[in-house]
Amino acid sequence: MSTNFIYPNAHLIAGVDEVGRGPLVGAVVTAAVILDPNNPIEGLADSKKLSEKKRLLLAEEIKAKALCWSLGRAEPEEIDRLNILHATMLAMQRAVAGLNIQPDFVLVDGNRIPTLPMPAQAVIKGDSLVAEISAASILAKVARDQEMAELDVQYPEYGFAKHKGYPTKLHFEKLEQFGATPFHRKSFAPVKKILGL
């Protein structure tokens, strides 16, 4: 972790991050993590910079060593109703509310923070600067990838395990060929177009 981030003066700090704002399908998944300072975890980094194997190993270690962790999500219908930004904020609120220890302070990756009952701060590139946010990004990514693998079993023709629901050339081709699944985000332009909305 970089040392140029100054931590707030707080005892129990939760890190929060999201995965899945860009995909055309599935939930946006968030995680909140309070790490144990007496039980450090080596190798925490932004989940996008880690191999899948390393992410899976770290996710297990985070779950075992963290003081507490929680996942929060917003479903495709909530994304369609609220818009992706508001749905992401809602999913973050759910992740923090799901912690079985209430944090004194919350650090959120990015430039926006949800409304929370405790002080919070947004940290640009937080997934590379703050261990708690890195841990949250890993848990959220592993959880969402798992959901895409399960969706791939249900709808093998779409290639969800490959593109994870992101708007790739392959995904567009499959959408054109097979139409949208019930899990596609109807408010996202490419899906809207396919559905003729």
Swiss-Prot record:
GO molecular function: manganese ion binding; RNA binding; RNA-DNA hybrid ribonuclease activity
Catalysis performed (reactions): Endonucleolytic cleavage to 5'-phosphomonoester
Domain annotation RNase H type-2: ranges: 11-197
GO BP: DNA replication, removal of RNA primer; mismatch repair
Keyword Cytoplasm: yes
Keywords: Cytoplasm, Endonuclease, Hydrolase, Manganese, Metal-binding, Nuclease
Compartment list: Cytoplasm
Cofactor: Mn(2+); Mg(2+)
Presence of keyword Mitochondrion: no
Enzyme Commission number(s) from the entry: 3.1.26.4
Domain of life assignment: Bacteria
InterPro entries to which the protein is assigned, alphabetical: RNase_HII, RNase_HII/HIII, RNase_HII/HIII_dom, RNaseH-like_sf, RNaseH_sf
Main localization category: cytoplasm
Disulfide bonds: none
The protein's enzyme class: hydrolase
Residues given in the record as a divalent metal cation binding sites: D17, E18, D109
Cofactor note text: Manganese or magnesium. Binds 1 divalent metal ion per monomer in the absence of substrate. May bind a second metal ion after substrate binding.
GO cellular component labels: cytoplasm; ribonuclease H2 complex
Job of this protein: Endonuclease that specifically degrades the RNA of RNA-DNA hybrids.
Family classification: Belongs to the RNase HII family.
Protein name: Ribonuclease HII
Species in which this protein is naturally found: Actinobacillus pleuropneumoniae serotype 3 (strain JL03)
Originating gene: rnhB
